[in-house]
Every structure is written in C-alpha cells, then in structure tokens.
C-alpha cells in the first residue's frame, strides 16, 4: 500500500514540518477513505507561525508598502486564483464533498473578493476633526491591528478564508490561518500563491491541526492582536471568552436556523426552488441554510408538494460527476448528527414526508437524502437547534404577525428569506426580522460588497463590504499644536 501524501505547515514562505512530528489523515467524504496527511500542529508550531507573522508585520517590506502597492498584490493574488481555479476546485471537492460544478462556480467568483479589497486598500483613511481652536490640528489614522489569527470551517474552506484574508491584508495586517482539521488541503494548495503574487514571506501562514491543539493556542497567543472565526456558536463563545480575557477583538460568524417565509401572493414556483436552494444546496451545510420553511396556510399544501416532489428527485452521488446534484456530508460525525436529529424529530412528533435515510449511491461516503418534516412545532429541538444538514421543517402560518413571531423565536439571527410580490410587505418584514441578512424573492445571494453580520448567537462583528475594514484596523487620534506662541505655565490660570 502506497503511503499517503504528506503536507506540512506553511510558515514564513516555507513548508515546515510539525514540531512534534505528528500527522493526521484527512478523509474523502465521498469514499470514506483517507487521501492525504496533514501536519498535526501544536502550540510550538503556532508560536513559530505567529513569530513569522509578527516579524513580517514589522518588516519594512510589508510595513512601509504603500496602500496602492498592497492593492496590486491583492489583485495579483485574485488573478492567480483564477489561473489555478480548476486545481483548487477539484482539491476542495475531494476534501469536503462539495459538487465540483459548485466549486467551479465558487472559484470563478473568488477572485472578485481579492479584486474588491484590492480597490479598497488605498481608500482606508482617517479624517480631520474640527478643533477647539485654530491652533490645534486633530486628525485620525486607521492602522492595521497586527497579527490576525483566522480559524476557518470545513464547509467552505476557501471562500470563508478569503472573506477574512482579503480585508485583513488590505488593511496591512499579517495572518496565521488554522483551517479545519477536516479540510486543510485547499488552503495548503492556496498558500504558495501568496508569495507568487508578491507578498513577503510570513505575511500569510497556515498551521494545520486540531482545534484544542492548534486553534486554542492561536487564540491564546500573546502575539495575536485579533481573532476571526467561523464555526459553531459553542466554539465561538469559548473564543469570545478567551479574547475578552486578553482584551483583544474578535469577529465571529456562527450558526443559524434561518426562516424562509412564503406568502400566498408569491411566485410559488420560484419560492419552492428558493426553498430547495436554501436548504439542500451543499447538502445543507451552510450557516445561512433556510432550514425553517414557513408557508402561509392558503398555499401550504401546494408549496409542500412542489418542494417534496423536487427533493425526492435530487440526484445524489459522486460530487465529481457532472450529473450529481447532491454530494456527501463533509465528515462522518456530521452524518451521525443528522441521523440523530431525524430520529429526534420523529420522536418529538414530526413526520418525515421525504428522505430521512441514507441513499443507495454505490459509494461508501457520508451521504444523506434530502429530508422534509411536517407536523412540527417551532418549539421542537429540530426547529430550534442547528442541524447543518439537508433537513427542512415546513410549518404553516396564518398572518404576517404570526410569521414574524415564529421566525424571530430562535436563538439565532443570521439570515431570513421572504417570498411575496408585495413590496410594502417586503419592507415591513425586513425591518422586523431579527436577522443580519434578509433576502426577498431570492436566497443565498452574496457579494463581497455587501456586509454580512449575525444577530443574537449567530455572531459578532461584520464580514464583507467596506464595514469589515473596521474589524481589522484600530483608530488613532493625533493632536498637533501649530501655534508659535511659547507654552505657558500649566498651573497659572488664564482668562
């Protein structure tokens, strides 16, 4: 049996073996077979990476680089990602099971993030503040915070790392990335492109490993000035506590249990497809998944029939195949979690009207059929807890007020969808839904230009758009006395 390919950490522009010599296998979720080994990072590896990032941050080659030049490097990187898109897309499909055609589309849009922040890099600026007197000049500077620790998830490794890297680098920071232990390959494939784009060594570093062994030391390291994390709300809380103890900032993009609300005047065909896209795309493994489908009683039966009819015909199988519409869940633990929630939902009184089982695919991977529940109450655990899989609950409502009450009755507040032809209703719903993103007659639309934030336990801080620059900069106020008059004795009062 041939040994698996091994990948080391990427630190200071070099492939670096793990300090303690350990490696761990990563599994292809479509086959349930290991396909490479990654370095098992420890506190010593994190310390080395943070040291490299701190050195790069203070190096004149990066510190004194003009903002315009930083923007050029980001544009170079975006172009290189476009050049390597097929390789990166295939790597991520093998690593987390997303459809290859979905990854190709994602990689086609990924350069836009770097190009957008390339254009923003030389527009990060302070302002002049009107002073108390003509002799006092007061202005502000917006400076990089320093070394950013970025901990990224397994569901969309490249995209969700890009949303952190691009603005952090545009602002002049250096970064240490700790990808999920389940999906390190695409980040390791991306890493050498930073130096090829012209970034000095150490500006971007990648340390692989498990959360407690590498992620924990990264958030606790004295050399890290800011932490950004995407993942579960439970882990996010622990990171927030660590950052609070250290008095450093953190940006958290966490879980969701998003409502997708359909009114009787909606285009029901489009709404049903919006439900399908909202919960079954990427096997439901998206933080904004529209897992709670709320349908007005007047059209409940019709919408349910449309949704279940399409869900039952979704083609499940090899994510590399062009005809496949639903790939596997990314990890074995997630498959077990989805199965346990489906069992729980039935025990709570819910009825499975579609799916609810592992499908026959001819593969040994972590596949689960698109599943639709009826007969559920919003107080049930399957309606309140994030499942992170292809499981939807379809619940009726009778009025706008009732829809809002159900939608907002959640610990989460990441996103919401509204389907209606009534533009006044759209505005009313958007104003009262407790969610950081509201979509009307669409779902899962994204752009690097549009800010994204989570309400309640769905997160803290902002990603995307111009607002995110505040997350990666600190504000400095500068006062200058321009008067040529000699300073007087401060203890003599003057009228």
Feature roles, as predicted:
Residues 1-30, 56:
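Hydrophobic face of amphipathic alpha-helices that form TPR/SEL1-like repeat modules
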Residues 13, 32, 70, 92, ...:
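Residue-level signal for inorganic ion chemistry
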Residues 17-19, 23-24, 40-44, 266:
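A short acidic/small-residue loop/turn micro-motif
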Residues 31-37, 224, 261, 315, ...:
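Conserved C-terminal structural/oligomerization subdomain of aldehyde/semialdehyde dehydrogenase
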Residues 33-124:
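Glycine-rich loop-to-alpha-helix module at the N-terminal edge of alpha/beta enzyme cores
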Residues 57, 61, 78-85, 89, ...:
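Structural signal for hydrophobic packing residues in well-ordered secondary-structure cores
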Residues 126-270, 397:
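Rossmann-like NAD(P) dinucleotide-binding subdomain of oxidoreductase/dehydrogenase enzymes
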Residues 234-377, 440, 487-489, 493-495:
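ALDH superfamily catalytic-core signature
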């Amino acid at each position: 049996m041939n040994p698996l390919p091994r990948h080391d950490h990427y630190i200071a522009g070099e492939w670096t073996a793990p300090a303690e010599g350990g490696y761990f296998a990563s599994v292809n979720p479509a086959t349930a077979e290991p396909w490479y080994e990654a370095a098992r990072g420890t506190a010593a590896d994190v310390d080395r990476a943070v040291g490299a990032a701190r050195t790069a941050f203070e190096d004149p080659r990066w510190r004194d680089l003009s903002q315009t030049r930083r923007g050029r490097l980001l544009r170079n990187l975006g172009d290189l990602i476009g050049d390597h898109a097929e390789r990166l897309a295939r790597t991520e499909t093998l690593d987390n099971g997303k459809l290859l055609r979905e990854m190709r589309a994602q990689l086609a849009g990924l350069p836009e993030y770097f190009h957008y922040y390339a254009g923003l890099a030389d527009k990060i600026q302070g302002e002049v503040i009107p002073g108390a007197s003509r002799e006092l000049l007061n202005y502000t500077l917006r400076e990089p915070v320093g070394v950013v620790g970025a901990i990224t998830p397994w569901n969309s490794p490249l995209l969700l790392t890009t949303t952190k890297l691009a603005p952090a680098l545009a602002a002049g920071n250096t970064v240490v990335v700790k990808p999920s232990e389940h999906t390190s390959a695409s980040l390791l494939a991306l890493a050498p492109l930073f130096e090829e784009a012209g970034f000095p060594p150490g500006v971007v570093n990648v340390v692989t490993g498990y959360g407690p062994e590498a992620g924990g030391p990264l958030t606790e390291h004295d050399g890290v000035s800011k932490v950004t994390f995407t993942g579960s709300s439970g882990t996010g809380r622990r990171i927030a506590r660590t950052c609070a103890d250290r008095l450093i900032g953190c940006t958290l993009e966490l879980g969701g249990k998003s409502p997708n609300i359909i009114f009787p005047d909606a285009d029901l065909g489009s709404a049903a497809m919006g439900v399908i896209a909202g919960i079954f795309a990427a096997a439901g493994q998206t933080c904004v998944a529209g897992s709670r489908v709320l349908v007005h009683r007047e059209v409940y039966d019709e919408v349910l029939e449309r949704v279940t009819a399409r869900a039952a015909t979704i083609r499940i199988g090899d994510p590399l195949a062009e005809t496949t519409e639903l790939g596997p869940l990314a990890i074995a633990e997630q498959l077990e979690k989805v199965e346990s929630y489906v069992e729980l939902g039935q025990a709570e009184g819910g009825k499975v009207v579609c799916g609810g089982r592992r499908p026959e695919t001819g593969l040994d991977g972590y596949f689960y059929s698109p599943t639709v529940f009826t007969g559920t109450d919003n107080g049930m655990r399957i309606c309140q807890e994030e499942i992170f899989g292809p499981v939807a609950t379809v619940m009726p409502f009778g009025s706008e007020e009732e829809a809002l009450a159900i939608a907002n009755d959640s610990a989460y507040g990441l996103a919401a969808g509204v389907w209606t032809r009534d533009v006044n209703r759209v505005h009313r719903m958007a104003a009262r839904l407790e969610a950081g993103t509201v979509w009307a007659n669409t779902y899962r639309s994204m752009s690097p230009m549009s800010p994204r934030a989570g309400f309640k336990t769905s997160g803290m801080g902002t990603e995307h758009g111009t607002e995110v620059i505040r997350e990666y900069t600190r504000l400095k106020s500068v006062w200058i006395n321009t008067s040529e008059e000699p300073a007087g004795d401060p203890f003599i009062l003057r009228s």
